[in-house]
UniProtKB/Swiss-Prot annotation:
The keyword Zinc applies. A divalent metal cation 2 binds at C8, C14, C16, C27. GO terms for cellular component: cytoplasm; nucleus. PANTHER family: METALLOTHIONEIN (PTHR23299), METALLOTHIONEIN-4 (PTHR23299:SF12). Keywords: Copper, Metal-binding, Metal-thiolate cluster, Zinc. A divalent metal cation 6 binds at C38, C42, C45, C61. A divalent metal cation 1 binds at C6, C8, C22, C25. Belongs to the metallothionein superfamily. Type 1 family. InterPro entries: Metalthion_dom_sf, Metalthion_dom_sf_vert, Metalthion_vert. The keyword Cytoplasm does not apply. A divalent metal cation 5 binds at C35, C37, C38, C51. This is Metallothionein-4.
Length: 62
């Protein structure tokens, strides 16, 4: 498993490192570079999207 990837429960908190590449979780809270996690309702977010500031939306979400 890639150490930069992490898994967290749906609606949980991602607690991963600076280079985290979350691809399988729906986080409500983002820590560090875990922002590519898709928020609830954005399950089809593209890999590599980023958070819009402090909001719970990804850059690839409508």
């Amino acid at each position: 498993m890639d150490p930069r990837e992490c898994v967290c429960m749906s609606g949980g908190i991602c607690m991963c490192g600076d280079n985290c590449k979350c691809t399988t979780c729906n986080c409500k809270t983002y820590w560090k570079s875990c922002c590519p996690c898709c928020p609830p309702g954005c399950a089809k977010c593209a890999r590599g999207c980023i958070c819009k500031g402090g909001s719970d939306k990804c850059s690839c979400c409508p």
